[in-house]
Amino acid sequence: VIKFLEKLSKGTPQHWASGSFKVRDLLKRWPATRPIRLLYIELRNSLRGLPRWRALRGADARVWTSACSSAKGPKVLVASSVGAHMIANSLDSMLAVALTLRGARVHGLLCDGALPACLACEANLWPDQQHFTKHGPSRTLCGPCFRPARRMWSGFGLPIHFLSRHLADEDRAACWRIAQTVAEAEIDSYEHLGVRAGMHARSGALRYFARGTLDEEPHALSVRRRFLAAALMATSALDRLFTAEAFDACVAHHGLYVPQGLLVDLSRKHNVRMATWNVAYRAGSFIFSHDDTYHFTLMNEPVTNWESLVLDEPLQAALDDYMQSRATGSKDWVSYQDNTGFSTSEMKERYGIDLTKPTVSAFTNVLWDAQVFYPSNAFPSMLDWLFDTVRYFARRHDLQLVVRVHPAEVRNPVRSRQTVVDELARAFPQLPDNVHVIAPTAPVNSYALARHSNAAVIYGTKMGVELSYMGIPTIVAGESWARNKGVTLDADSRAAYFALLDKLPLSGGLDEETRRRAARYAFHFFFRRTIPFEFLTVRKGAWPPFRLELADLAPLRPGRSPGLDLVCDGITKGTPFIYAAETLIRQGRSSH
């Protein structure tokens, strides 16, 4: 049954598909299939999606009992919160066990249906949006989300907190009253108990709709108010929990959306050490950050963490080997690139691109992903940047602009409901002759395109790290992680951005010293900031993309995994989340 449901949910045979439309897309639009999809979510999480800690604990009963009874270390809240998120609950629960084995007093956190909206809510689960605006997830998603996670977390014997137990009826009423009456223009900036509830509610609503703007969503305002109510309730409940328990540290995935973003703000308010994490690029590895989401910390990380790194022959060889693999994603969790389209003649024939002409490539990012306020952005949004860029190049007949739309628009598990191709077609019914758009489904490799470019312009894509490593001069207008590293041309205003464009075409690529600096940062980012866990089995093309391969608790004990030891020390002691990959490589040991 679960295999059949998985086929319905995740994909269809090729002969069932026509273009980008698949049977699964029809199922997502058909209200009658929602019970099947919800049943699939619960069965998947219950039967094989989440670790079976009760059995593993039994295999090491004496060790586990002793660890729990003797734990006298820091009090740590592992705040998975969203039960349906299999990656979060799998990794968080592993961290809970590992921290306990190192003496920490670990508590868990789950939402038990207390919130009227959250990270688990996506528009494709509610083909009838009025049902969601009226009832939220309570009648459909909350049960399948909560039940499997509760069973998994109960296998520890550790304290676990439920949001509803820290939320009084009067809190709910007050939060709903605020959410329904606050002026529309004030929703995004609304603060509650010193927390940026409105900002995180906005991020949640954009993710729900999988859109970067909500102008054309008829139920957008109702959904925004629902997410604001959820953010207010989560803030009230978590503020009460933090006051009562006096945690020393907190662990939360993402550090964005509802309720995870609120945990970051509340940890800061209560002087609780916060560690956020997310899946990294390299297969089997994760990114951890202190005190904020990695979307902020990676932009503002001190350059002293990496600029003096010496890339000797073993390190340079490891970096070059990995960076070459990025074109196909063979060493990553997932690849958004096709190993096709390398021929310049093919690009010219299929897309009208003449790479003998000075070419500037614009690489987009997913419109809705991680949309929070970035003070250094030169434009209000990626679409504003892209539209103004096209208008600029319409006047520059000496140059050619190629817009490569991010393949994740259609390959991401949360498929975008607003696409760059559609928005460009709406804004420019007739594109300028020197502007070409490559759709996310097109068999063109972004790295091959970059190699033929005089320069690149980006907004928030993470590809800025690779572009600089490749020696491509890159102008950054948004929140790319390559910003502030001394390897890109960073614009903090529209005027500064266009002044940089006026210098195009450039006479050559990045100078040798800047390329060496870019290589040092690329090694730091891909090898030192991404932390591997050896006991994970990577499952490419599956969900979740990894499985904990544990016969007992031994691999999680201190001294067994350098990456796990590093992460646990970072959570409990505040030490940097920087993995000593260079040491392992120089010793001839694989770091990933």
Residue ranges and their predicted role:
Residues S81-L91, A252, Q371-F373:
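A short, glycine/small-residue-rich beta-strand->loop->alpha-helix junction that serves as a flexible
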